[in-house]
Amino acid sequence: MFARLTSTLFALAAVSAVFAAPGATTEQCNGGEVQCCNSVQDANNLDSSVKKIITGLLHLDLKQITGQVGVTCTSVNVLGIGGGSSWYGFAFSYSYILASDWAIGVCSTQQKVCCTNNSFHGLIALGCTPINVSV
């Protein structure tokens, strides 16, 4: 019984430490949402595969798209929870939280951007502005 109580208290303390982590980010952007995108491309210089997605799947006019386009993006909101990842894993495995960049809103190999049109289920995001992360 004592061991179970100790384990439970340790797990709660560990989870609390993650939520209080100094690296945690609650970045927001004016009129948009912070995203982690696998790539960010200029609307005037899109890859042919991205053009096909925009015109073929999404039925958008390329001439109407300006600025930066995020490709394959996931949302990063408070501590990253509720984004494109399945956040329920943290309830079952503390180590999963520590190993997951999205748990603290970090884009490890992706570009962090602020995008104003994210209504394409992560396929693309429009109106993106890169967010520079200083270390």
Curated annotation (Swiss-Prot):
Fetch the InterPro entries from UniProt: Hydrophobin (IPR001338)
- Compartments reported by the entry: Secreted; Secreted, Cell wall
Q: What are the disulfide bonds?
A: 29-114, 36-107, 37-73, 115-128
Enumerate the glycosylated residues.
117, 132
Major localization listed first in the record, in broad terms: secreted
Signal peptide coordinates: 1-20
Q: List keywords of the entry alphabetically.
A: Cell wall, Disulfide bond, Glycoprotein, Secreted, Signal
State the conditions that upregulate or repress this gene: Expression is light-dependent and positiveley regulated by the GATA transcription factor nsdD2 that binds promoter regulatory sequences containing a GATC motif.
Q: Which Pfam families match?
A: Hydrophobin (PF01185)
Q: Name one GO molecular function term.
A: structural constituent of cell wall
Q: Which GO terms describe its cellular component?
A: extracellular region; fungal-type cell wall
Summary of the function given for this chain in its UniProt record: Aerial growth, conidiation, and dispersal of filamentous fungi in the environment rely upon a capability of their secreting small amphipathic proteins called hydrophobins (HPBs) with low sequence identity. Class I can self-assemble into an outermost layer of rodlet bundles on aerial cell surfaces, conferring cellular hydrophobicity that supports fungal growth, development and dispersal; whereas Class II form highly ordered films at water-air interfaces through intermolecular interactions but contribute nothing to the rodlet structure.
Family statement drawn from the similarity comment of this UniProt entry: Belongs to the fungal hydrophobin family.
Assembly and partners are described as: Self-assembles to form functional amyloid fibrils called rodlets. Self-assembly into fibrillar rodlets occurs spontaneously at hydrophobic:hydrophilic interfaces and the rodlets further associate laterally to form amphipathic monolayers.
**What's the protein called, per UniProt?**
Class I hydrophobin 2
To which species is this protein native?
Coprinopsis cinerea (strain Okayama-7 / 130 / ATCC MYA-4618 / FGSC 9003)
